[in-house]
Amino acid sequence: MNNNAQNKRSLDDSNGNDTKRPKQEDPKYILPKQVNTYPATLPERKKNIEYILNILTKKQPNITNPKLKAIDIEYEIAKKSTNATYKTVFRQEVFKLTKPTKSPSQLSPQQEHLKKLDQEAKELKILKEMVVSRKTLIAFGYIMEPPESIPNEKITRICNRCGTEFRLDQQLQPIVCEFHHGKKQRGKYICCMSNVDGQPCSKAKNHVYLLNTPEEKQALLPYQFTKELFTTTSTKSKSRVLGIDCEMGFTTKGFELMRITAIDYFTSKTVLDIFIKPIGEIVDFNTRYSGIHELTDDFLSWEQSMEKLGEIMDSETILIGHGLENDMNAMRLIHENIIDTSILFPNKWKTGPTRRWSLKDLAFEFLSRRIQTGEHDSCEDSIAAIDIVKYFVKKRLQSIGSSS
């Protein structure tokens, strides 16, 4: 019997049709089930099945047919994913699998609900105390008032990657742009560990640039106050606390917003994951960091994206992120309730506007979690920022409990 037949039978069994079927055994080899879409390559899907299998066997040593179970889990992921969303959905499912199993509660459903509400109220009180002051937000580069609009009238720009001056009207003409995609640390580039004067390790076909001033950004797309943009009439549907992360790509208009991902703090569920069509013509999707490969029919207009965002948040919603001023600038939003993990650390970290720890380092330090090991994933970053905040909230709750 081949692997496909075994996989089909395992799916039938899971639907309750096992009364007339012989007991199934794990296949000798792992083979992903076929789906109508093409969310990922076969080797990548197989690797992910093996990853799921490893989790299952560690958490449930006595599980029956773990390979079939892992194949089925990955199949459900692939079935509801596209090439753009497969990695995100996979990471979300892995997160669910790795969450600690809760012991059965002796409380009634009503008591459980009341206990949950009480816990959330305690956490929300602490979160409100953690909101960064307006003065500090300004010091860390947040725009808190709409700037003057100064249109871009330059005919040349400096490439953000290689430092070459180029003409804007020739930006889409193919050239060779050589650069290091990693930052400099202790005299070396972290992307290839070469010296500062070493040969660039990356190449691109076009030069790219940023709108460097708030005034230029205001001229392209104006900033808006969330208290004016988002209604507060139906607060029940709004999230009280959100982890948010944005992805940008290079266009002929600079560095534009192309994706918004929002995770609810209390449920860890993705409540928003949308793609935005930029104003300018695409120059570089910045895939290494954005995870975006192409424009599809799923991309929304700017106005549509703001409508979607307004469905889940308002001016009272606390937003959590890392270096969130970049995301707020990308969305052109002015918001008061911010918790920025690049700002809120113990004094020993000596965080300042010009010296901040990366989300990757913080996740490893406080969560013992390695993130950003492959292609960038906005959901992973949002969850990491939320979990870092939860780490401090938990410590605060423990401190309150021990002193009472």
From Swiss-Prot:
InterPro entries: Exonuclease_RNaseT/DNA_pol3, REX1-like_exo, REXO1/3/4-like, RNaseH-like_sf, RNaseH_sf. Residues 241-389 form the Exonuclease domain. 3' to 5' exoribonuclease required for proper 3' end maturation of MRP RNA and of the U5L snRNA. Residues 1-17 have a biased composition (Polar residues). The keyword rRNA processing applies. Residues 18-28 have a biased composition (Basic and acidic residues). Keywords: Cytoplasm, Exonuclease, Hydrolase, Nuclease, Nucleus, rRNA processing. GO terms for molecular function: exonuclease activity; nucleic acid binding. This is RNA exonuclease 3. It is found in: Cytoplasm; Nucleus. The gene is REX3. CDD domains: REX1_like. Belongs to the REXO1/REXO3 family. Its EC number is 3.1.-.-. It comes from Candida albicans (strain SC5314 / ATCC MYA-2876). Its main location: cytoplasm. The keyword Lyase does not apply. Residues 1-29 are annotated as: Disordered. GO terms for biological process: rRNA 3'-end processing. The lineage of its organism: Eukaryota, Fungi, Dikarya, Ascomycota, Saccharomycotina. One of its GO terms (cellular component) is nucleus. It is an enzyme of class 3 (hydrolase).
